[in-house]
């Protein structure tokens, strides 16, 4: 089995300039998937920043009922952690819709983006989010040569 046929990749949050406000990512529909892994890429962190990644879930399409998942906060990052990633894996959320939230406070933190990887698809051959993923390829036992 190869990974790309059993997952769905979505860019859940675009880059956000330095700031101290929390940023909500896109709401993902988890129907058909057992889990989602969020990978938050951070840029420059200013001394005394308090930056972390958490997940929220809800039953409403528009996210009006989103609530934090208990214990889901990863971080906070150390001041020396500029240009590192935070990874949060949510397996079998109890509600249909899930989103990442990058929590920033005290001093500036740059967000390079958040990628969501939904996995354990109940129906294989999933299609990545065309609104955020431009291209995807699978190569099985490729020969060496020009790319």
Q: Model regions: which residues?
A:
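Surface-exposed, low-hydrophobicity beta-strand/loop segments enriched in small/polar/acidic residues
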Residues: 1-147
